[in-house]
């Protein structure tokens, strides 16, 4: 059974935020495959069905308390991505560090318009 097909993230100004996601998502294993005036689309292939991540312009969108978390293969990958998000303009970075319980290592941050994101790794028990 498929658990997640796609994420459609809303942003108030696509042109302002596009460079952030065009650097972040490829570092997470996504490939950009579509760009139109108000929408970017990325996909990630793996052992399961293809996953899609869209960034859509919605001028009246305001960030809220929702958070999207991405999986990292290792603690080192979380650390590498934490450096990248700082370099590309992430806001309110917390971590990387252990949080949420034993073996849960993550960095929490916001994109340049305030959408909440996370990159995490769960150590094997």
Segments (PLM) and residue ranges:
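Core segments of cupin and vicinal oxygen chelate
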Residues: 8-51
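Short amphipathic alpha-helices in soluble, non-transmembrane regions
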Residues: 20-23, 81-86
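Eukaryotic scaffold repeat domains enriched in small/polar residues
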Residues: 54-55
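Short polar/acidic secondary-structure junctions
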Residues: 58-60, 98
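Alpha-helical elements of the RecA-like P-loop NTPase motor core of helicases
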Residues: 18-19, 79, 117
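Vicinal oxygen chelate
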Residues: 5-12, 60-84, 87-125
């Amino acid at each position: 059974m498929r658990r997640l097909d796609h994420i459609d993230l809303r942003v108030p100004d696509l042109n302002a935020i596009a460079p952030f996601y065009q650097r972040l998502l490829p570092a997470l294993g996504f490939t950009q495959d579509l760009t139109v005036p108000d929408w970017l689309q990325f996909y990630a292939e793996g052992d399961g069905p293809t996953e899609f991540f869209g960034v859509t312009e919605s001028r009246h969108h305001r960030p809220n308390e929702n958070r999207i978390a991405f999986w990292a293969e290792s603690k080192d990958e979380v650390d590498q991505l934490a450096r990248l998000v700082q370099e590309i303009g992430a806001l309110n970075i917390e971590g990387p560090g252990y949080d949420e319980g034993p073996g849960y290592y993550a960095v929490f941050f916001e994109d340049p318009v305030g959408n909440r994101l996370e990159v995490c790794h769960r150590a094997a028990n």
